[in-house]
């Protein structure tokens, strides 16, 4: 990752663009960086814009308003990547947009932002604006409607400050974004200290764009990131979570982790992960190095993970630093149990949903579950296979092995057992149901559920054969006497 920080490099291809350099896609070679006060227009064939965005653009232009394709969509189109969203910037204030398009929601009218619904597709329309004073490191206290040039120079990075004029079929550049896109550089617009002071989330966005595009961060921008890194802790948990998700589900997730650490952004956000640095592991099991390097490698071996799976991989060894000890060798006793509790705290801090949190905690808690997979009682294996997130656990175990010693025999054996379990067909009907036990005197409640689960475990383990009810009832009577159930001679 050394070439991704602090200096430029020869233009190169981007993920998804094949071997063509960016300069080729832009139709020209690099020129000098354009100052903020200059306007540069470069002819470019019209992009394949969504029908909804084109309809809104036409409506604005026909009403006498200026309308330009803006931001990330322009960047991606020039890189040869299909944008996921098409945003427009316009001279029309939000109220005017609402007049022109009845199905408009003013989601951020105080900041000049509206969403127009066209055939069930949303198009974001933002009024050209200049941001006034920032006080909270997130948003301006007020905005002033203005022109395209001032709108461009208040944005975060030069490659995101480009417009496309659909009428004149030209890229409009006020900030030198074309040159930085051709060179492959992440550069803050204007004064980087000011940009990061305005919105501290930009610190994380710089990292994400750098690793996802494969662009180095320009030197002055990088130095400003280091100066402002501690302030990232003031970004709201929800915004941090969203940026982490974008980084962790991207193929460059391991590079993102390493660069977050080098940028001094990891410790303010995830000190538990930062603590993995320098924590040695037994070399016979972990020839790759310390816990941090292992974690980065595990992330790199995931294949198109969901966010909970990727976060579970990031946190799976979070319990190792506090449990480190040297006995006969380096050991991390019960790091899975402690790690699960720590992971739950991280998930709560990041405001994850309960479903996401449950999956992450399950993955951390059970990431060693396959160590004795062949020796497990069939009932225990079945309970593991029936877990909602078992397949995520299997994917994590494969990545865990590939990110250390490379021996994947454990997850392979687990997968064999799992496939055999699936091939056996639908689950068998229970031998007993609660009503059958209640008829002979057992009481409803948690203990009844425990008894029924024990019956099914006994059948899986071969203690009960067949599907007959009477032998199962006798098995229950022998192990869960009714005297205990009624409190006669047992605990009240």
Question: What is each of the regions a protein language model found here?
Answer:
Residues 1-492:
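Catalytic cores of the polymerase beta-like nucleotidyltransferase superfamily
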């Amino acid at each position: 990752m050394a070439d991704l920080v602090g200096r430029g490099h020869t233009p190169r291809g981007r993920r998804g663009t094949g071997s063509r350099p960016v300069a080729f896609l832009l139709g020209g070679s690099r020129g000098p960086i354009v100052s903020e006060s200059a306007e540069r227009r470069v002819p470019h064939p019209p992009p394949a814009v969504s029908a909804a965005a084109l309809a809104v653009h036409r409506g604005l232009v026909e009403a006498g308003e200026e309308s330009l394709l803006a931001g990330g969509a322009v960047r991606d189109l020039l890189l040869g990547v299909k944008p996921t969203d098409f945003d427009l910037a316009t001279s029309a204030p939000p109220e005017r947009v609402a007049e022109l398009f009845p199905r408009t929601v003013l989601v951020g009218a105080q900041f000049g932002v509206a969403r127009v619904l066209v055939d069930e597709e949303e198009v974001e329309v933002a009024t050209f604006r200049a941001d006034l004073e920032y006080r909270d490191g997130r948003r301006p206290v007020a905005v002033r409607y203005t022109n395209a040039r001032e709108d461009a120079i208040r944005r975060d990075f030069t490659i995101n400050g480009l417009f496309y004029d659909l009428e004149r079929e030209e890229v409009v550049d006020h900030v030198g974004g074309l040159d930085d896109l051709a060179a492959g550089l992440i550069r803050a617009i204007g004064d980087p200290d000011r940009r990061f002071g305005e919105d501290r989330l930009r610190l994380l966005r710089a990292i994400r764009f750098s690793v996802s595009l494969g662009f180095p961060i320009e030197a002055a921008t990088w130095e400003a990131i280091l100066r402002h890194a501690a302030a990232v802790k003031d970004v709201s948990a929800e915004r941090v979570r969203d940026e982490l998700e974008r980084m962790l589900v991207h193929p460059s997730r391991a590079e993102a982790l390493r660069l977050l650490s080098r940028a001094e952004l990891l410790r303010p956000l995830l000190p538990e992960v930062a603590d993995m640095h320098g924590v040695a592991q037994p070399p016979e099991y972990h020839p790759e190095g310390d816990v941090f390097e292992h974690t980065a490698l595990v992330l790199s071996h995931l294949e198109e993970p969901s966010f909970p799976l990727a976060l579970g991989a990031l946190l799976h060894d979070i319990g190792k630093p506090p449990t480190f000890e040297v006995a006969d060798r380096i050991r991390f006793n019960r790091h899975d149990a402690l790690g699960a509790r720590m992971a739950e705290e991280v998930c709560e801090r990041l405001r994850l949903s309960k479903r996401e949190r449950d999956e992450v905690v399950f993955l951390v808690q059970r990431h060693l579950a396959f160590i004795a997979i062949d020796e497990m009682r069939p009932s225990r294996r079945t309970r593991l296979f029936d877990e909602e997130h078992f397949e995520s656990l299997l994917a994590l175990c494969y990545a865990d092995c590939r990110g250390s010693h490379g021996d994947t025999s454990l997850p392979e054996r687990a997968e064999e057992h799992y496939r055999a379990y699936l091939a056996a067909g639908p689950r068998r009907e229970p031998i007993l149901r609660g009503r059958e036990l209640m008829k002979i005197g057992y009481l409803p409640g948690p203990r009844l559920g425990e008894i029924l689960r024990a019956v099914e475990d006994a059948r899986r383990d071969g203690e009960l054969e067949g599907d007959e009810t009477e032998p199962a009832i006798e098995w229950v009577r022998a192990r869960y006497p009714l005297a205990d159930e009624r409190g006669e001679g047992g605990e009240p």
